[in-house]
Amino acid sequence: YHSGKTDDLHTVINYVLPNYDSVYLVGFSLGGNLILKYNGDGLFNLSSKIKASVAISVPVDLKGSSIALQRRENTLYNWRFLLTLSKKMYLKHKQFPDDLDIQSLKLVKKLTDFDEYFTSKINGFKNAQDYYSKASSKQFITNISKPTLLINALDDPFLSESCFPITEAKKNLNFNLMTPRYGGHVGFISKGDFYWSEHQILNFLNSY
C-alpha cells in the first residue's frame, strides 16, 4: 500500500455505505493523508452520505516530511520504521518469492531509500520523488468540498514547515486547520479517559 492509494479507501467506503445513512472519515498520520487526498483529488465521486472528515498529525507534504524524518533527533524513529518495514518485506518475500526482489534492502539506510527502492516501484511510480509528488494531499486541499478538519501539532517531529497548509486553509472555507503548540505525532495526551484530539474529533463531527 501507499499513503495516496485512494482506490482502497473508496472500495471500503462503498462496501459500508449501504449500511449507514451518514459516514464520517477519520485518519491518522499517513491515513490522514489518504483521507485528505480522497476528499480533494477528484478521482472519485464522493457519496453524499460522507458528511465530514478529520485528519490528525498528517504529513501533507510527503517530501517535506521525509526530510524531517532524516533529522538527527529522529534517528530512533527512522531506525524503528525501517526495522518494521524490513520485517514485513521478508515476510512478503516468503509469500511471493517470484514477485518481490528484496536484494535492495541492503541499500536502505533511511525511509527515503525504502520509498525509492520499494514503495515507489511496487506501486508504479518512477521513484520516491514521483511518489511524493503525486501522493501528497497538500496540493488537493483547496479542492475539498466537504467539511474537513486537520490537526497538526507544531512540535510534531515528523512534520516539516510545509506540512502546515496555512495558505490552503485560507483559500477553502470547507477546510479547517488547527495547529496546537503541543501534541507531538498522534499524541495529544490530556487528563481523563480521552485524548485531547479525540475531543476535537467528536466536537467537529457532531456539528455535521
Model-assigned labels for residue ranges:
Residues 1-19, 24:
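Alpha/beta-hydrolase active-site loop
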Residues 183-196:
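Catalytic histidine-centered segment of alpha/beta-hydrolase-like enzymes
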Residues 24-122:
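Alpha/beta-hydrolase-fold enzymes
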Residues 144, 150-152, 156:
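Short beta-strand/loop motif that positions the catalytic acidic residue
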Residues 138, 154-157, 182-184:
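Acidic beta-to-alpha connecting loop that harbors the catalytic carboxylate
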Residues 10, 14, 36-40, 202:
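Short, hydrophobic alpha-helix immediately C-terminal to the catalytic nucleophile
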